[in-house]
Amino acid sequence: MVTVKFKYKGEEKEVDISKIKKVWRVGKMISFTYDDNGKTGRGAVSEKDAPKELLQMLEKSGKK
């Protein structure tokens, strides 16, 4: 199980990569949306801290 750890509004969060819906790049950050128990959650992680699976999802989406 691969998870992405990130901070959102000052709170440490962790999400399973299988719950991530959409991934895109904003400068040197990787932003994403994920399923948060029926709601849409948002997160971002720096490119250097992103797990390789998240970077692969970004490549597949074609949004470089």
Swiss-Prot record:
What function does the entry list?
Can constrain negative DNA supercoils. May be involved in maintaining the integrity of the genome at high temperature.
Its Gene Ontology cellular component terms are:
cytoplasm
Task: Please tell me the species this chain comes from.
Answer: Sulfurisphaera tokodaii (strain DSM 16993 / JCM 10545 / NBRC 100140 / 7)
The entry's description of pH dependence is: Highly stable from pH 0 to pH 12.
Report the SUPFAM superfamilies cross-referenced here.
Answer: Chromo domain-like
Q: Which UniProt keywords apply?
A: Cytoplasm, DNA-binding, Methylation
Q: Is DNA-binding among this UniProt entry's keywords?
A: yes
Q: State the protein's name.
A: DNA-binding protein 7
By sequence similarity, the record places it as follows: Belongs to the 7 kDa DNA-binding/endoribonuclease P2 family.
Q: Which Gene3D superfamilies match?
A: 2.40.50.40
Any one Gene Ontology molecular-function term assigned to this protein's record? RNA endonuclease activity
Summarize what the entry records about the temperature dependence of activity.
Hyperthermostable.
Q: Which residues carry this modification: N6-methyllysine?
A: 5, 7
The record ties this protein, via InterPro entries, to: Chromo-like_dom_sf, DNA-bd_7a-e_arc
Partners and quaternary state?
Monomer.
Task: Spell out the subcellular localization from the entry.
Answer: Cytoplasm
